[in-house]
């Protein structure tokens, strides 16, 4: 699949855009601020995909004043976005320094999935919308997903096999970066290894993998914007992947590249705001 001309063109476009972003003037000294702001914008965008609409200014204020110490605040929308922000901030903590040699250790794939899922779904458990024993724990046996998605969510041995394949793909030493990130995202959507929060965790994994694999090392691309802006295209591409055809999988990978490119454009806007000192109003 990585040799398909459409996939190769998509990956080339992503790498070119990310290279331009990498050498943005704002990231020479203020990359930490840019990553922090990207985590906020990513949480707002991802929340919108999930139906939780919160103003960026509201989340920034909550973060700045340290009010997000509890999983449940009484505002379900804010709680959902805060969980996404916590997960995004966790990813930032695992990113190598953009300037310097710091390279934090990243947990194994199963632990990575569990940690991100706890951040994302913890607020749902705190408010009683999912059971505590579903948080950070993949489905097994005949446990059904609470979420819809493309195709039929597997169960039993099929589910166990899909989850094992997902873990192996995340940890594979050599894999085409864009294809890996795209397939991991798609498997979260279609296999739905958890009872809830699969799509959001899938989008977080894309950000993590593209940074880890060196495609988008700045960690500032906001890849969640595109699925929120054009949800029909997101659903259509996911359905194409779930069809199991090569054409469908290629269409999904190309869609994922488009989402990354939109995220890079948002990162460039973010960098301009950081450089101008107006990023809090971004």
Stretches with model-predicted labels:
Residues 1-282:
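FIC/Doc superfamily catalytic core
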């Amino acid at each position: 699949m990585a040799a398909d001309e459409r996939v190769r063109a998509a990956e080339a476009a992503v790498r070119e855009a990310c290279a331009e972003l990498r050498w943005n003037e704002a990231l020479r000294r203020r990359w930490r601020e840019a990553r922090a702001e990207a985590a906020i914008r990513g949480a707002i965008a991802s929340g919108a995909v999930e139906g939780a609409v919160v103003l960026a200014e509201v989340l920034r204020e909550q973060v700045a004043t340290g009010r997000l110490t509890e999983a449940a605040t009484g505002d379900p929308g804010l709680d959902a976005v805060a969980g996404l922000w916590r997960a995004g901030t966790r990813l930032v903590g695992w990113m190598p320094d953009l300037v310097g040699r710091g390279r934090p250790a990243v947990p194994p794939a199963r632990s990575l999935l569990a940690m991100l899922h706890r951040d994302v779904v913890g607020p749902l458990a705190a408010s009683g919308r999912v059971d505590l024993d579903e948080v950070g724990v993949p489905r097994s046996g005949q446990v059904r997903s609470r979420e819809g998605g493309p195709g039929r969510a597997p169960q039993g041995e099929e589910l166990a096999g899909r989850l094992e394949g997902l873990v192996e793909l995340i940890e594979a030493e050599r894999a085409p970066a864009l294809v890996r990130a795209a397939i991991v995202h798609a498997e979260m959507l279609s296999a739905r290894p958890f009872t809830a929060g699969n799509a959001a965790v899938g989008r977080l994994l894309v950000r993590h993998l593209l940074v880890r694999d060196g495609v988008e090392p700045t960690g500032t691309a906001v890849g969640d914007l595109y699925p929120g802006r054009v949800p029909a295209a997101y659903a259509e591409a996911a359905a194409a992947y779930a069809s199991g055809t090569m054409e469908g999988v290629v269409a999904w990978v190309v869609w994922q590249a488009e989402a990354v490119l939109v995220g890079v454009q948002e990162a460039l806007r973010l960098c301009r705001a950081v450089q101008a000192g107006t990023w809090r109003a971004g």
